[in-house]
């Protein structure tokens, strides 16, 4: 859903910079491109009853797919200033209209069916860096990054249109559905209801402070005017989100790792599950939506290289779950983690095997709402026998030639949509990715 770019470098937990650079080339402009195609099938599963927003067993499409093509253009403006723009095309059709699950099995899938393809500007922003001193750091050429030199202590300001996941809840091992884990609740923190339109992008500003092994980030960005829709409140005054994250780089037995702590608050037009429970008959979120509703939450996010070939990650995320999901998915608490093994162990340097899991849950008031037949943008079986939604994901990513990768991905999901009367269901995906 939200499109980020990460690299699988020599160390499992890697940086895109050199603290003591041996080369210091800088660029005035650059251009990159990526293309990703994902096709997914699912098996038949136990389906004793269904509701309006159920994952369908019979009567669903036989194959879901998505495709994206993104251009990355960057230009140097003046000292410390850069401008980036990303034109993008998307085509896709999800299983069951993207309903019946919280951990959607394709991280590239947007909210809604798009056939034929749509075209839009995914990102358009300016970045200003103010160097404050310290060691020289060389930032390598890449998507949305000009090759340049900065100092280890610096302030970076970004303003425009971007994805919050470009900056927050990063993780070298699990962050990019184009090259890593596919499931929504494994690729990022499931309970992080990050501000975004239905394509995964937002508008606003980010400020970052870097000093050696510490990084502090804060952002004020737009939320959708109506939950899970495309239209954002670009005034940043009525429907908005604030987040702060601190990151620390560390060493464990001489192996690199990172720990991140993120807090967020969403302020916008949302309905309260508790308010619906006073209604007679089937509860309805739309009728209790109110402006100025708040949702708060946090994320703890760690990654660690264990050996030169093996890395691990773990995330715990939580939000208060009192109000409806405004931008991501129906999860109010989530534990996810996994391991990635590099192919250098079997002389395939750029291959990787990943094994990950997610255990997702929702607030008690949402459980009661769904049991009484209520609907959310993602869930609604007519009733439910609640249990956590549990997903196991396994993938093998094979390097084909420079910039090209093919991935075979398997996911096993228990209790889809938090309903232990339904499922389990298995998904098999093939992903083709190219970047230049």
Residue positions per predicted region:
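Short loop/turn motifs that connect adjacent beta-strands in outer-membrane beta-barrel proteins
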Residues: 10, 15, 19-31, 42-44, ...
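N-terminal regions that are enriched for targeting/export leaders
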Residues: 10-80, 86-88, 368-370, 377-379
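Surface-exposed coil loops of outer-membrane beta-barrel proteins
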Residues: 100-116, 136-241, 245, 284, ...
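Residues on the lipid-exposed face of transmembrane beta-strands in outer-membrane beta-barrel proteins
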Residues: 33, 69-75, 124-128, 159, ...
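Transmembrane beta-barrel strands of outer-membrane/channel proteins
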Residues: 31, 35-39, 85-89, 157-161, ...
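Outer membrane beta-barrel transmembrane domains
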Residues: 245-247, 262-292, 313, 320, ...
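Residues that define the transmembrane beta-barrel architecture of outer-membrane proteins
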Residues: 27, 63-69, 117-122, 199-203, ...
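Signature for the C-terminal beta-barrel architecture of outer-membrane proteins
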Residues: 184-312, 316-323, 330, 341
